[in-house]
Amino acid sequence: MKLTSTLTKNSGEVVNTSVIAKNNSIGRIFTMIEDWCADNDADYPRTCDVWKMNGKIQVSVKTRDRQFINIFDIED
């Protein structure tokens, strides 16, 4: 299983695409993302919405000064 991350600005511009994990279950990856979102740093506050859909995990993140969407494609 391979996890590819595509980071997109609110404008739709793709910022980065990279393979970030191999050989992890979808549940474990989803939990890692939820944990990252829950680990809210007072110096860098953020809010996240995380959901699974059609073999993808989508994360919408808002910080003080920006908003972005990260879509994780999961391949077997």
Where are these regions (language model features)?
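A short, exposed loop/beta-hairpin motif centered on an aromatic-Gly-Thr core
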Residues: 13-24
